[in-house]
């Protein structure tokens, strides 16, 4: 089993250095690393060039691909990383985020998970007092995903999910990873495991943690959920038109209740954005 670590960066040199240190200090060296820089002007590109040369000179270089060029946003950058990654599992460790210790990759290999998504836990800005935990398997359902999410920075995702269901939606600015989890885990019923281990030290300087971004998050989530319900509606019709016609009144009631539930959730603060 091979792991691909994908790091996205844009004008965050100090955060990138923190991420790099935690990656190259991993005790288990059998992984590949893809770094996608969005054409930074703060010295990040020069730092990546120097890092790549030094790792090659020292005889161990996990960087299999890197680039520094303008992109169309964070999900466009992530999709670039997906295209060039060859591991069985992907982990997105973006600049500013870091592994909580040097044995994360080793422990992931030795646990021998086989689920489609393996979600570890995170600490926040170096503090376990601000820890966030992913749900246990029995707690992960549609209601959970409406009001919360799987934490992306500590989730190991099988490559085949992107190949089968598509990449991140680049039309969304903030919630495309949440949309991906919603569709593959709830609609497609892909397998999931909660790894009860702190994996990532999450930096709260990203766009999703900015309070000014919350209206965008709510708006994008509502649009995704509306599309999700409409797709479910169409899938019933396509699967069995006769049963669909018989159950249409019931479906209408269920849909109305779900919409009311969604509206209720979105009138309250969201967590784990």
Language model features by range: what are they?
Residues 1-4, 32, 179:
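Cell-envelope/extracellular polymer assembly enzymes that use nucleotide-activated donors
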Residues 19, 68-85:
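Glycine-rich, basic loop-to-helix element that forms the pyrophosphate-binding segment
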Residues 29, 37-48, 94, 98:
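A conserved acidic beta->alpha catalytic loop
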Residues 90:
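Short aromatic/hydrophobic "clamp" motif used to bind/position activated sugar donors
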Residues 132-224:
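Conserved nucleotide-sugar donor-binding catalytic segment
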């Amino acid at each position: 089993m091979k792991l691909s670590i994908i790091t996205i960066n844009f004008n965050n040199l100090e955060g990138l250095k923190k991420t790099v240190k935690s990656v190259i200090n991993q005790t288990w060296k059998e992984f590949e690393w893809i770094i996608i820089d969005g054409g930074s002007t703060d010295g990040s590109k020069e730092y990546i060039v120097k890092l790549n040369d030094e790792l090659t000179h020292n005889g161990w270089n996990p960087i299999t691909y890197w680039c520094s060029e303008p992109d169309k946003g964070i999900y466009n950058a992530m999709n670039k990383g997906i295209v060039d990654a060859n591991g069985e599992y992907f982990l997105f460790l973006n600049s500013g985020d870091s592994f909580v210790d040097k044995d994360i990759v080793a422990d992931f290999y030795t646990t021998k998970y086989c689920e489609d998504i393996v979600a570890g836990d995170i600490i926040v800005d170096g503090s376990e007092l601000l820890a966030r935990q992913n749900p246990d398997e029995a707690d992960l359902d549609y209601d959970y995903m409406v009001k919360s999410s799987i934490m992306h920075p500590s989730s190991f995702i099988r490559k085949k999910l992107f190949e089968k269901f598509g990449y991140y939606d680049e039309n969304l600015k903030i919630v495309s990873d949440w949309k991906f989890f919603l569709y593959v885990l709830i609609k497609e019923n892909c397998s999931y495991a909660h790894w009860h281990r702190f994996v990532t030290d999450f930096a709260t300087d990203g766009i999703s943690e900015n309070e000014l971004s919350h209206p965008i998050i709510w708006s994008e989530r509502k649009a995704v959920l509306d599309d999700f319900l409409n797709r479910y509606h169409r899938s019933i019709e396509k699967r069995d038109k006769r049963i669909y016609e018989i159950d249409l009144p019931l479906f209408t009631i269920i849909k109305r209740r779900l919409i009311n539930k969604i509206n209720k959730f979105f009138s309250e603060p969201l967590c784990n954005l």
